[in-house]
Swiss-Prot record:
This is Kynurenine/alpha-aminoadipate aminotransferase, mitochondrial. Residues 179-208 are annotated as: Disordered. CDD domains: AAT_like. The gene is Aadat. Residues 198-208 have a biased composition (Polar residues). The lineage of its organism: Eukaryota, Metazoa, Chordata, Craniata, Vertebrata. Its main location: mitochondrion. It comes from the Eukaryota. Its cofactor is pyridoxal 5'-phosphate. The N-terminus is blocked. The modification N6-acetyllysine is found at K179, K263, K339, K351, K367, K422. Pathway: Amino-acid degradation; L-lysine degradation via saccharopine pathway; glutaryl-CoA from L-lysine: step 4/6.
Length: 425
């Protein structure tokens, strides 16, 4: 693929940082090399000397001596080598990307670690979006992505979707305003990429089926656009077998996949990873070299030690426990909604993730209801207009998260909300 046509002038202009290059060399160099190159501080002046973390199974992860010094030091902009290796093998096991054995020029799969999935997404958007570019999205969409893209000046086209995600026929109709060959003409403003959360979409909780993904991928091939597969809830799918991913069917090297460990290991450690064609991953890393320099070394080492301790089977067993927890939480909030909101509101059963998307009947705009009156009754929810490109337009929806609240709290919130809806109707 010709990736240069997708890149912004800023991204094309990025060059390797000479100082960061020495860090990459040091990460692969033999231990006896004497380096006066990097401006790394001497760990003797660091006040922290050791750390011990206790895992839920009672085992420990211990940092001391050289290992702890390394944890407190600068590291590779790609991510630490051992974590990169572990995550690459995980991607191969879970997705078996067709591009694994491609040459770099053909779109060979590569991977880099980012400071959380959001950091990776922002770098992807800044790599791809010029002012005036056309971007495909399915509304409602994740507000973090929406507000990262908006300042870059792109033109959004919303693709029809339902409780099974993007509707391929709707996407086909949107694309019919162009001819496939128009992608070779920059003045035609053909779509540069499709952005979507395929599993447990934030805020709707819906998931895209494998069959629909295949149809969408073929349309991406026909009209030559990229697919940004933002999948932070991949490990929170409530039914098995899990649906195949866009990455698993990417024969062209046109999928950029964003993964997160926030939902199953820790959100505060800020470790995510981006998988995609090598030439695009390199562009993301060049951005990291001059922004944050690298993801947090201590966070990466903590997660790496844990993953190697668990192994793939142990990690996936932990994922299954997380799924069981969130599935129970989902069932609790559905029971509370059915008890108090039946007849007052409508919702679909989330297939993954941690959100329930609710439409209030008989109210055209729930913004004031949620932002003012609900808070007066000591309940906090997110109004639906936050998840639309035109967030000034009225929306009768709101988002409820079921990740942290107890069943009793869910019941109380919906009891208060039901009374509030009745009061204003």
């Amino acid at each position: 693929m010709n990736y240069s046509r997708f890149l912004t002038a800023t991204s094309l202009a990025r060059k390797t940082s000479p100082i960061r290059a020495t860090v990459e060399i040091m990460s692969r160099a033999p231990k006896d090399i004497i380096s006066l190159a990097p401006g790394s501080p001497n760990p003797k002046v660091f006040p922290f000397k050791s750390a011990v973390f206790t895992v839920e199974n009672g085992s420990t992860i211990r940092f001391e001596g050289e290992m702890f010094q390394r944890a407190l030091q600068y590291s590779s902009s790609y991510g630490i080598p051992e974590l990169l290796s572990w995550l690459k093998q995980l991607q191969i096991k879970l997705h078996n990307p067709p591009t694994v054995n491609y040459s770099p020029n053909e779109g060979q799969m590569d991977l880099c670690i980012t400071s959380g999935c959001q950091d990776g997404l922002c770098k992807v958007f800044e790599m791809l979006i010029n002012p005036g570019d056309t971007v495909l999205v399915n509304e409602p969409l994740y507000s973090g992505a929406l507000f990262a893209m908006k300042p870059l000046g792109c033109n959004f086209i919303s693709v029809p979707s339902d409780d099974c995600g993007i509707i391929p026929e709707g996407l086909k109709k949107v694309l019919s305003q162009w001819k496939p060959e128009d992608s070779k003409d920059p003045t035609k403003r053909t779509p540069k990429f499709l952005y979507t959360i395929p599993n447990g979409n934030n805020p709707t909780g819906n998931s895209l089926t494998g069959d629909r993904k295949k149809e969408i991928y073929e349309l991406a091939r026909k009209y030559d656009f990229l697919i940004i597969e933002d999948d932070p809830y991949y490990f929170l799918q409530f039914t098995k077998p899990w649906e195949p991913t866009f990455l698993s069917m990417d024969v062209d090297g046109r999928v950029i996949r964003a993964d997160s460990l926030s939902k199953v290991i820790s959100s505060g450690l800020r470790v995510g990873f981006i998988t995609g064609p090598k030439s695009l991953i390199q562009r993301i890393v060049l951005h990291t070299q001059i922004s944050s320099l690298h993801p947090c070394t201590l966070s990466q080492l903590m997660i790496s030690e844990l993953l190697y301790q668990w192994g793939e089977e142990g990690f996936l067993a932990h994922v299954d426990r997380a799924i069981d927890f969130y599935k129970n939480q989902r069932d609790f909030i559905l029971a509370a909604a059915d008890k108090w909101l039946r007849g007052l509101a409508e919702w679909h059963v989330p297939k993954a993730g941690m959100f329930l998307w609710i439409k209030v009947n008989g109210i055209s705009d729930a913004k004031k209801l949620i932002e003012e009156k609900a808070i007066e009754r000591e309940i906090l929810l997110v109004p639906g207009n936050s998840f639309f490109v035109d967030n000034s337009a009225p929306s009768s929806f709101f988002r409820a998260s079921f990740s942290q609240v107890t069943p009793a709290q869910m019941d109380l919130v919906f009891q208060r909300l039901a009374q509030l809806i009745k009061d204003v109707s």
